[in-house]
Each structure stands twice: as structure tokens, then as C-alpha cells.
Regions:
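Short hydrophobic/aromatic-enriched beta-strand-loop microsegments
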Residues: 69-72, 157-165, 236-242
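Short catalytic-loop micro-motif centered on adjacent basic/acidic residues
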Residues: 44-49, 73-74, 136-139, 159-163, ...
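Glycine/proline-rich, positively charged
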Residues: 26-29, 36, 40, 79-186, ...
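Structured C-terminal cap/extension of enzyme domains
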Residues: 39, 43, 173-187, 191-335
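Conserved, mostly hydrophobic/aromatic
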Residues: 6, 18, 46, 59, ...
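A general structural detector for well-ordered alpha-helical segments in enzyme core domains, enriched
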Residues: 2, 34-35, 58-62, 87-91, ...
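Conserved residues at the C-terminal ends of beta-strands
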Residues: 19, 49, 103-106, 141, ...
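N-terminal binding-site loop/beta-alpha segment at the start of enzyme catalytic domains
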Residues: 1-70
């Protein structure tokens, strides 16, 4: 496993980290098995969040007895000092630790970032927690290029997390700026939220960029971990065949697709929006029509039940035309 220094933090971390979203689908014992497998294979960076339901709690159980071998990162959507201070304490309790290596401001659009930095904003609590030894370093995660640009100019920002993958490389210049400013860059959504099926090619693409400090694919089992390890540990140049695969993936996905971040939820009509688009993808792109239709049939609310309120679109960090996409999905499923 290759190791990198995470920017200004000085922390030595593995080139591949562990994305903590998918462990919401397993259990505490399964998480413990994964943590020990990470340790065996030299993966020492773990990412989670207050908003990932039971992820922090499962990781707290899974890391018992081996916490000191890992660089632990979490994040909070809180924007005020009071709320952030509470979240930091909850994270410490959930993770069963007395310190967190990196605490991040989670998905702050430009207006929210201004609130964070204002008097009484979340930055005050983060700074106080750092001074008290509760957290080691402060970072930010974003889905907006404007937020990324703003974060690059903030002296307290030690790391930036942003989507980077085969079909989303708009931030390449900003990622390079991170390297120039000694800001650690954490590549999230290397598989575009599951839209890219070929995990090996996807991870090989991300790791081919020397400005990426760490990539954090989500993993829910040891088979996924082993596959990802094989991809990241392969340091050979990208082949002609791999480049061709990447072009095909770009052509198939374009830019208008769901990354399954679920920031659009809750839907006013009760539709599981990301599930609709997941099954629609399998129907349209991957030739699994029967499976996609059978899974879609299990949804309690179908795409055709969209009431057109637009609340989801106002929350989508990718500005997707969700209402029209739901209409298209409904038509494909014969509604």
C-alpha cells in the first residue's frame, strides 16, 4: 500500500481509505471484520459522518482495540457553533474515542460556508475542539465548485473532499491547486455514487492523478475490499484498453445522472428517488431489465407519483432536473 501525507495535517495515510456510507447496510460484527481486514492490508484512513445513520456507532464497535492504528475522519452538517459542538461530542461518543483526527464541515454550499465562518458559526466550535484536543484537524467537504474555490482561500482549511471520477473531472485544476497549497485532497464518489459499475477501472483512473491524496470508495464486504485493493495497488500506467473503457463509460453516463447522495430526500410524495434512478440505470444501461423491473416493483411509491413540487431539485447539489428524470423513468417502466 502506498502512503501519502494528508496536506497540512502531516498525517501519513494510505492511498485508499474506507468510505463509511455502505456499512449502514450491514451490522456491527460485519464492520468489525472489515476493520481488521483493513488493518491487515495497510488501509489506515476511515471516513464517516454524523449523517450516515449508524455508521459512526458501527465503526466505534469495529475499531475497539485497534483505534490507534487508524486516521479517523468524520463530519457534520451543523452550521452554528452550538450545534457543531454537540455533534463533535456525539461523534466522540459514537466512535468510542477521545479524539478524532479530522473533523469536516459536511457539504456546505457557498451561503452555508459564510454562516460557518461568521461569528457564532460552526468554525468557532471546531477551533475550540481542536484547541481542547478533541479533534486534530479541520476540513471541508463539498459538491459545489464555487465552495471548492472558496475553501482554497481559507487559511484554516487543511483538507478538501470533493467528487472526482471518470465522468466528473471538472475540479482537476482545483485539485492541483490543493497540492500546490499543501491542502490534502480526498476524492469521494470514485464510482460516481455507484453509477460506474467497473470499480477497478474507476479507481485506477482516480489514482492515476498524483494530486489526489486519498480515494475513499465505500465498501460493505471483504470481497469489495479485495477488489479495490487490487486496483489501488496496481501502479502501472493506464493501458490503451483502460482508456477505451473510460471513454465508453463517459459516453454511456454523460453528466445527467444520479450520484445517490440522497440530499434530495425526503420526497414530499414519499418516492425513494435514488432507488428509482438506480433501477432505471440497470434497465437502460446494464441490460438487466428483468431484475430492474422486479426491484422497481418493490418500491412503495413509483416515479409516476411525483407531484411536481420541485423540493428535491432545490436540494440537489448537482442541479439535476429530477422531476423530468422521474417522468422519463416512469415511462421506461411502463407507467
Amino acid at each position: 500500500m502506498e502512503y501519502r501525507i494528508l496536506g497540512k495535517t502531516g498525517l501519513k495515510i494510505s492511498r485508499m481509505g474506507f468510505g463509511g456510507i455502505p456499512i449502514q447496510r450491514i451490522d456491527a460484527e460485519g464492520t468489525k471484520a472489515l476493520m481488521h481486514k483493513l488493518l491487515e492490508n495497510g488501509v489506515n484512513y476511515i471516513d464517516t459522518a454524523r449523517g450516515y445513520t449508524v455508521s459512526e456507532e458501527y465503526l466505534g464497535i469495529g475499531l475497539e482495540g485497534i483505534r490507534e492504528h487508524f486516521v479517523l475522519a468524520t463530519k457534520s452538517m451543523s452550521r452554528t457553533a452550538e450545534a457543531m459542538a454537540k455533534d463533535i461530542d456525539i461523534s466522540l461518543k459514537n466512535l468510542r474515542t477521545d479524539y478524532i483526527d479530522l473533523y469536516q464541515i459536511h457539504n456546505a454550499p457557498p451561503a452555508d460556508l459564510e454562516k460557518v465562518c461568521a461569528p457564532g458559526g460552526a468554525l468557532e466550535a471546531l477551533t475550540a475542539a481542536k484547541k481542547a484536543g478533541k479533534i486534530g484537524h479541520i476540513g471541508i467537504t463539498a459538491h459545489s465548485l464555487e465552495t471548492f474555490r472558496m475553501a482554497l482561500e481559507l487559511p484554516w482549511v487543511e483538507t478538501i473532499m470533493f467528487p472526482y471520477n471518470i465522468v466528473e473531472d471538472q475540479a482537476k485544476e482545483l485539485i492541483h491547486a490543493c497540492a500546490e497549497k499543501s491542502i490534502g485532497f480526498i476524492a469521494m464518489k470514485p464510482l460516481a455514487g455507484g453509477a460506474i459499475e467497473d470499480a477497478v477501472t474507476a479507481l485506477r483512473y482516480v489514482c492515476a492523478n498524483p494530486d489526489v491524496t486519498v480515494v475513499i470508495p465505500g465498501m460493505a464486504d471483504i470481497a469489495e475490499l479485495n477488489q479495490n485493493l487490487a486496483a489501488v495497488n496496481d501502479s502501472s500506467p493506464l493501458s490503451v484498453e483502460e482508456e477505451a473503457k473510460m471513454r465508453a463509460i463517459r459516453d454511456a453516463l454523460g453528466t445527467q445522472f444520479c450520484r445517490r447522495c440522497n440530499y434530495c430526500q425526503p420526497c414530499s410524495a414519499g418516492i425513494s428517488i435514488s432507488s428509482v434512478f438506480l433501477f432505471e440505470g440497470y434497465l437502460s444501461r446494464y441490460g438487466l431489465a428483468d431484475w430492474a423491473r422486479s426491484r422497481y416493483a418493490t418500491l412503495t411509491k413509483k416515479a409516476s407519483e411525483c407531484i411536481g413540487c420541485g423540493a428535491c431539485e432545490s436540494r440537489c447539489p448537482y442541479h439535476l432536473p429530477i422531476r423530468s428524470m422521474l417522468k422519463e423513468a416512469a415511462e421506461k417502466f411502463g407507467e
